[in-house]
Amino acid sequence: MNYKRENFDKVVRLADYITSTSDPKMKWMWGEALLGYALDELDRECGEEKYTPFLKSYCDYWAKVDPAVDQSDTAAPGLITYAMYKRTGDAECKRLTDKVLDYIRYEPRLYLDCLNHLGSSKKGKIYPKSVWIDSVMMFSVFTSLYASENADTELVDFAARQPKQYASMMLNEKEHLWAHSYWVKRGKAFPRRNIFWGRGNGWVIAAFPMILDNIGLDHKEAPEIIELYRKTSEALLGVMNDDYTFNTLLKHRSYRELSATALISAGWLHGIRCGYLNERFLEPAIKAFETCVEAMEESDDGIFMTEISGPTIPLPLLPKLGYKMIPLGKNWSYGVAALIFAAIEYKKWGSASSN
């Protein structure tokens, strides 16, 4: 396999298109948070600050509005505010970051060290108290990053315990795939009956190597995180489509979904680079990324990532039908973020393979 620079460049054009046509006053929400974090990581990989003005404008806007941080999804923007604080030293970026940290440190725990995913938000007061696998990306990645860079050993340990605790609640030990949530009152993962959401398993595969980067391989929790990552990767290899994509439901007939595909590609390439996976995963990882790029649409109207399922929750009633009924869209923020993460890892692989 050969590295094709045009694949990386196409994703960069997508990032440029989004930042040049979108209002930086994006939502204070998880999808926008991941997009902003991915843009800053893309800048870091390229040795640039191309997207800093866009992301700093986002922070400036929310510094005036003073957003609520009341759930994992509204803690995720700490990824942007912390990145911009490191870039600029701006006091308001630090204040917003500290607000997220206060939530992480002081929000009551729901089960073990884990928080109610929907927190004290309006949705959290209606939906059953539960831990969601989404939190591994929306909550644990930032926590591990901030803690490691600021020598906060207590917070590092807290973040490092999260993957094992999520596994105790949501990992199907027979299939080695992850349920979307764990309902605490029932004491069970939900949904059941081998309903495994593709993007949720993508969060795991993309986030675990990020967390390992942050806590370090000498941390006592690292070996178990790697083992969980490997077993789920093996399971995912067994449900991959012939075109190297993944469906929105991994073991049931459903449509192919490219945010999950991009997340898994990114996580596999990251894991191969760090030695967690062997070379057997390389071709599937590369082909998955290339398939996502091939599915992009580019014309005078713009450039778009396609086949991204809309925001998804584990519906209390008829959850399998609920996943299947979520419509596909283009350029959803979290889907673009996933593709950028994969493009970054693809570029790293290309650089390493050329040396």
What are these regions (language model features)?
Residues 18, 104, 166, 211, ...:
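Hydrophobic alpha-helical packing residues
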Residues 13, 54-57, 99, 158-161, ...:
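A non-catalytic, amphipathic alpha-helix used as a structural packing/dimerization or gating element
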Residues 2-33, 40, 45, 49-50, ...:
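CBM-like carbohydrate-recognition segments
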Residues 203-251:
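Oxyanion-binding "anion nests"
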Residues 146-157, 211-223, 271-279:
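Inter-helical turn/loop segments and adjacent helix faces that build the functional surface
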Residues 27, 131-135, 151, 158, ...:
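Short, contiguous, pocket-lining structural segments
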Residues 52-53, 64-185, 190-192, 298, ...:
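Extended ligand-binding groove/face enriched in aromatic
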